[in-house]
Every structure is written in C-alpha cells, then in structure tokens.
C-alpha cells in the first residue's frame, strides 16, 4: 500500500468520511475529517495536521471523537504499514485545539497536530 493510501486508510478508520485537505466536495455532510497529506523518505519526520468538522450546538461528540483518535495514536504512537516500511504517527504538541467558524456558529472544528516519522525505503 502506498504511503498516501496508508494515511488515507488511517484517517478513514474513525467512522467518518475522510478527505485530503482542499478536496472536500461542496455537498459534504457533517461530520467529517480533513487531513494534510505529507510524505517523506527514510528516517524523516514531518508535521501533519488534521481537522474534525462537526455541525452541532455541543462540543460533546467532537470531543469524544478527538479522544478516540488520541487513544488510537496512544502515548507511544501508532505504526501503520506501507510500501517499503512503516509510518510512525505520534501526537504533536498541543495535540488538539478547538476552533469555530465565523460564518456558522454551529460548525465546530478540532485542529489536530500529528508528527509522522517515515521509516521507509524511499
């Protein structure tokens, strides 16, 4: 599986539709995840961001999903296999930040900071 496919598979594993940043269709239905696709070569780290997008009066569901993702990555990180090796995902600092949307006060966003270490042949 390519690096891009492995990263997509990871973000798609949370029962939400996952979109690479800037590819969200105009008719996308909340909630969903957007993620930054960054790839590197052997023994290089790269900062990666993702966002959870919900439309709700409450932060309860988005906070629960943020915690689910945090637990999946865990304190020691999450290793995902890909062609030529693995990608080691780790929680960044700060891991999650709450954001709103100026155009719609019901839109809730959690901005996630991740570090991806690429242990791959290329």
What are these regions (language model features)?
Residues 1-22, 27, 34-122:
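Charged, amphipathic alpha-helical segments and their flanking helix caps
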